[in-house]
From Swiss-Prot:
Keywords: DNA-directed RNA polymerase, Nucleotidyltransferase, Transcription, Transferase. One of its GO terms (biological process) is DNA-templated transcription. PROSITE patterns: RNA_POL_BETA. CDD domains: RNA_pol_B_RPB2 (cd00653). Its EC number is 2.7.7.6. GO terms for molecular function: DNA binding; DNA-directed RNA polymerase activity; ribonucleoside binding. The keyword Zinc does not apply. The gene is rpoB. It is an enzyme of class 2 (transferase). The RNAP catalytic core consists of 2 alpha, 1 beta, 1 beta' and 1 omega subunit. When a sigma factor is associated with the core the holoenzyme is formed, which can initiate transcription. This is DNA-directed RNA polymerase subunit beta. It comes from the Bacteria. Belongs to the RNA polymerase beta chain family. DNA-dependent RNA polymerase catalyzes the transcription of DNA into RNA using the four ribonucleoside triphosphates as substrates.
Amino acid sequence: MAYSVANNQLLRKHFSTIKGIIEIPNLIDIQKNSYKRFLQAGLPPSARKNIGLEAVFRSVFPIRDFSETCSLDYVSYSLGTPKYDVGECHQRGMTFAAPVKVCVRLVSWDVDKESGVQAIRDIKEQEVYFGEIPLMTENGTFIINGTERVIVSQLHRSPGVFFDHDKGKTHSSGKILYNARVIPYRGSWLDFDFDHKDLLYVRIDRRRKLPATVLLKALGYSAEELLNYYYQVETVTVDGDSFKKKVNLDLLAGQRASTDVLGNDGEIIVKANRKFTKAAIRKLADSNVEYIPVSEEEIVGKVASTDIVDVSTGEVIVECNEEISESKLEELRTRGIVEFNILFIDHLHVGPYLRETLLLDRMATPEDARIEIYRRLRPGDPPTIKSANALFESLFFNPERYDLSVVGRIKLNYKLGLQSPEDQTTLTKDDILEVVRYLIGLRDGRGTIDDIDHLGNRRVRAVGELLENQYRVGLVRMERAIKERMSLQEVDSLMPHDLINSKPVSAVVKEFFGSSQLSQFMDQTNPLSEITHKRRLSALGPGGLTRERAGFEVRDVHPTHYGRVCPIETPEGPNIGLIASLSTYARINEHGFVETPYRIVEQGKVTNEIRYFSALEEGGHAIAQANAPLDDDGRFLNELVNARQNGEFVLIQREEIGLMDVSPKQLVSVAASLIPFLENDDANRALMGSNMQRQAVPLLRADAPLVGTGMERIVAHDSGAAVVARHNGVVESVDASRIVVKIDEGEVDEDGTGVDIYNLIKFARSNQNTCLNQKPIVKVGDRVASGGIIADGPSTEWGELALGQNVLVAFMPWEGYNFEDSILISEKLVKEDRYTSIHIEELECVARDTKLGKEEITNDIPNLGEDALKDLDESGIVRIGAEVKPGDILVGKITPKGETQLSPEEKLLRAIFGEKAGDVRDTSLRLPPGVEGVVIGARVFSRKGSDKDSRTEYIEKTEIEKLLKDQHDEIRIIRESTHGKLESLLVGQTSASALFDAAGKELLGQGEKITSEVLAEVPFARWREISLLDASENEEKLSAIMTSLAQREELIKAVFADKIEKIKRGDDLPPGVIKMVKVYIAIKRKLSVGDKMAGRHGNKGVLSRVLPEEDMPYMADGTPVEIVLNPLGVPSRMNVGQILETHLGLAARGLGVQIQEHLDRYYTPEAMRTKIGECYEDDRVAEFVDALPDDEVMQLARQLSRGVPMASPVFEGVTEEQMKNQMERAGFASSGQMTLYNGKTGEAFKEKVTVGIMYMLKLHHLVDDKIHARSIGPYSLVTQQPLGGKAQFGGQRLGEMEVWAMEAYGAAHALQEFLTVKSDDVTGRTRMYEAIVKGKHTLEAGLPESFNVLIKELQSLCLDVELLEEQE
């Protein structure tokens, strides 16, 4: 593709109208940042924040023994260097991990028996080994046991308080019942809910429910305090025979007056039985009325807020929370009570729920309430006040048992309007009281319920946090063991390492990385699938949802997903909606909420200030679309602007807009943003398109798309597939397997060497058996910029993602071969290897130490001819480059046989003639069926201390040679650059003393002027001995430079010596294994019938026929098309994007053809510049091309002759006008259709056909991997039926429906064969075999084994069933 030497990248013609305001953040930062925060590896212990690993240690330590006489305190932790680097871990099957050392302090105390005062007796500090912790590679993955794994981030419900209702489903009446739930990060859940009688209940950890007031009383509140907390109190004054109450203006709204209410001037403000209106309340306030009259009927039935007591006798007339009846009211009168307090409950704005719940609960004291809670949580345990108090305190108020986390506290404060500090991560009494108050408010019609699918209520747990939780689990297990050891042993004689056994911690970490649901085998099919896997968000996993329980709401797209989670990319099938992908610009904040960037808008003017907003922060803002038309000053052109507000689309005044999207592709994920014309595709097909791009196999020759979206470069750069330059510099040397770059002077780090060596990955195997191969795209002498791409990886071309090939397609039916989405292709594609891919299989052979003796890897295998062993070397391992077919031996191995009892004669013969060859059997590694290819590598792993065979020595020698070459190059480049520096210092100076060589010959005379020629005579190693006449500081510089050179050389040598030592050392093999050999085979897969192919728009199909080139339909100029697709696949699927892509691709190819014509006619470089400028219609490109030297312009033209690459970004793609314009410029009809001719007859087809360039991918569902046939093979032990599946070399299952079909045809004999001899009739099988051998063709079917199994099953149920033979 078109590229420039200056920056090694494709020149894409961009059609986007919206300037990029902000760079897309690094695509795998979600992984890297999370783990960096967790480890804090680069920071000194004093500078570490209380997060991640540090927080875990601080939360579990100090550990005290049961008698509080000694404690184990945490000081700090440090990480060592990993034993193997990433490459070695891949090869040896090791885990890439660093050792963790923790510095702990053991303090023992003397306790004074009388006063209880503690005095320190002894302090011991020690560093303890704490197992290993896996490290993350540069690309955001982990290497566990030699395979790359990804930890998927989990989307779970945020801790905090959630209010909800049951939508009327719980009770038969359909009444809406509200509930509240306090969810901590860890600890007991607390639920409050109403029942259909409006009583309030509480559940702790989903146990049986209690009246909520029991919990409130257990907090230490009395009934009276609770009533006064939740209800407002009115004071009633007894005035002779009548009553009046104090005016409380807040409570009057909506109430009725029981009698006329008069102002101070006697004017009637509210008539009897009329409501207090706002105007009336205002009048009351103005006339300063203190009391209003109340009728007796109004007071009867009200509730006393405190005990009403007769002061003279001390007798309680009306108890707190008791209704005042007529008789009680009379008694109050007669006893001369002057005033009393009642609760304000109007059954309109304030309901009697809590008061009625109090009537239900009989607890008198907090102790009773706590004992009741203890009974519910620990049924069967006899409760004591002490144990009940301890349990209650530990439920919600003990930081070790209960943790809301900072997020939970923030959410709680936000919802309930509290002011608690963020580090208060346990519940407080106020929290519980306020939750109840908010819930009662909901029942009374105030407040709103929460939407649990809102992204403000769901947060992301990334790697760091998931591992932090696991580490805490391991530490807590260890804590118990430490406490027991402290109390069992005498502490004075112990050191910290005697107490600590880090096994539980290592085991938990190992288990998490090895077998957690969120630790997944990385999808490494191509660079896009890697990136997508790392950006995935899963609602499944421990502490998350399960597929079965997840309803429709959780899976659905939510308005808050906009710009945070992609609405398109999710798997089809049972996981739909539960697994999502992060949007392109989204990031995760420190609290785990997903944020998206917006531009700030001030008074209708869009600024370039960018702020990230979480879903909660964005609430209420009116947010304009990224494509809203603006003038040059950044103001909205239209009076009314399309915007989003609170999850709705609205038309709104431009002055009210507060934020604006940064880019149209902010909405979608990386995979979806790679689909051009996504806006013209149906969502279901876009979903398939984004999922299928992840299954595209890397092809032999990558071909970047002619019609792209501009995201291709970013994906290739961030995925780690391509090699990215670490510093600015100049390319020193390049070959296929490495690039050496000399770093610019100013860029060298303190401890750096000044040289970057990039060893490229050559034909390595990925997790999915695809081929990983990197090839350089720079030349010697090229300048490289930091962050620039210097080598292409799998599926990348010129630093851009290239998953498929640009092919010429026609939409037309062709003799039925594209029926039902089949695809017809030209043989040309197969001939040119356009869709050929390389797959690498790894096969392993292990020699073990068995009971009968050692297995041996050798080429001396009994009973095999020369032909079978022709490709094995003397060590018994296949040579590299051998072409192998199924059944060929890759590694020769013999295993000792079990000794049989020998007869005396045999023993005698043995004694005379020695051992015979018959006591070993051939257990060689052979190539499995269906695999055919070339051996490209073999690795031998042998135990430490065992003799190395010739193959191992050869492999070691080549690896060491490679390392020594790297070492030599690094030292050479450093010496050259130092040489230059020193020469510039010395030339022009005068020498102070003469310098002689070993033979006494003068190299430099005293007082001689130093020149380059003179220096050339002096050996470089002796330059430091040159003394100068008048330059003391130059001498210092000279000495410093030489010393620095020596140090850097030493450093390089030490690093390489260490690497060489590792190669020579033996390998750590599993117990019982003597030697292990891995053989790698490269398989070339050409495109063949049955392979699955797809475009980027969800247009998938299976290859139905490969047609000779001359039979394909051809264009007027004789060009045959390469692929024929069915036009009926478009209308019903509604993915019109593929047609638009085809049109634009045609225009791109047409412009390329025009450039080729210029080349063919030998136009001058100047004319070439003009032509390229015309094609791009972009001033910046024109400037760039004008600045290029002539030869590079011609090189660029040759690149562009294949087609001018274009970018049509998502949601801001090419308009219809632009499309027609491009087609016409390229010399085609604006309809994009043309007459095609039948390749077989040469006649024109009747209708015009849409023809153009489409980007097609070959997917990882290859027919060679799936096709399978069984002759005889393994049988299941129990049923004696053949196994199923290709891996087991199984048969094809014949189910009920197939039997019905055979019955329908009346094919009785065939059916009997299917069900007996071909399946599980054991005796019949052997009889059949014998009959075939003898040449008799008769079927004698016996009894199927599965029938015997059925009889045995019945007999196990005590039903005696037996078969009786029919009597003749």
